[in-house]
Amino acid sequence: MLLPLAAVLHGCVDNPKASRREPVRSSTSVLTPRPEARQCLAQLALTKASFTPVQDKYYSGGCSTIGTVRLASLRSDTTYMELTNLGPVTCAAATQFAGWARFGVDRAAQQILGARVARIETFGSYSCRTVAGTSRLSGHATANAIDIAAFVLEDGRRVSVLDDWDGGTAEERRFLRVVHASACKRFGTTLGPQYNAAHKNHLHLEADGAQFCR
């Protein structure tokens, strides 16, 4: 049931050669979530995001979608921001994403670009793979990371990480750097074009405790 909140395509390009794992049998508890899960869902509801809880699933190779939701839209100060290509994402990441989108993105767009954000385009969330060059699972392997590709404003302008991080107007470049800096304050790991070539077209936002901002 979609919660109006009163009451993936691909993910980050960590390891494009990594094989996708097939799901294995899993037990679910989505109808009777643990107390901490219920608390997180309640916190997410307070953001007035629209979301649907997702059934827990375990996959081979250590991948999983546990305590996840599907976000339909996020609340700004006056309306809702649409989302594209976003699969299951952990409740914790979704809650951080909701706060960042409203206070770090939409308000920055108003102040710097003179228009509100109508849509946030993503490259997805869950994807079962490792970080490139390592055997360590990516944050996407547990649906704990989101890749942000672009922002579409209410006046139709589209500001993308790929085209506008270096090639946009002065205002667009400033906007992207402000939202990147804001993400660093909310997410444990935030990676952008200045990190490496694999992130030249998106911002990688991960809800972990790493405190790593590049």
Tell me what each language-model feature is:
Residues 1-8:
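Bacterial N-terminal signal peptides
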Residues 9-28:
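Bacterial Sec signal peptide processing site at the extreme N-terminus
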Residues 15-21, 66, 72, 137, ...:
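Catalytic cores and adjacent binding grooves of peptidoglycan-active enzymes
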Residues 23-42:
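N-terminal low-complexity, Pro/Thr/Ser-rich intrinsically disordered segments
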Residues 25-31, 87-96, 134-135, 161-170:
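Second-shell loop/turn segments in exported
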Residues 36-120:
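Active-site acidic/histidine clusters and adjacent loop/turn architecture
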Residues 111-143:
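Active-site-adjacent substructure of cysteine-protease-like catalytic cores
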